[in-house]
Amino acid sequence: MRCPYCGGSETQVKDSRPSEDGAAIRRRRVCPDCAGRFTTFERVQLREVVVLKRSGKRVPFDRDKLQRSIDVALRKRAVDPERIERLVSGITRQLESAGEPEVTSEAIGELVMAGLKGLDDVAYVRFASVYKNFREARDFEELLGTLSDGMPVPAAAPEAEGDPEPEASGRRRAGRP
């Protein structure tokens, strides 16, 4: 395996163990040329899956692209990396074992949305807004309505006239009745 730091062609495996979900082998490698250390993952590929894009173009399925799109949706969210890896591995395994040589990009998007919905609501909304090409605030409102089991999201209740604002600490500030 080529070193990602110096490009050296010979690297040595220092440690090898199965990943937590058992779907991959994690290998720690070191480059004898530059002493750089890096991690690789070895996975079984059941079959070549071809993605049929909306434009009609056919491209090979790219697990790394799937990982990146999920990472973007989960950016700055407190989700355990192992859970993210399980989601990506599960979607990949599902696509490879489906028996279909081609899968639409829409089908992959639906699998990602279903996985993110169970993982993190904010990431689900982020991904859906790009995947479904939201154009208006109403698009978000409709999606948020589905998060609460199809029940519409309640609007904030208007304040009654003459009611004082609630105090955060329970104390009134000086000079107020």
Curated annotation (Swiss-Prot):
A zinc finger (unnamed) spans 3-34. Residues 148-177 are annotated as: Disordered. The keyword Nucleotidyltransferase does not apply. Residues 49-139 form the ATP-cone domain. Binds 1 zinc ion. InterPro entries: ATP-cone_dom, NrdR-like_N, RNR_NrdR-like. HAMAP family: NrdR. Belongs to the NrdR family. This is Transcriptional repressor NrdR.
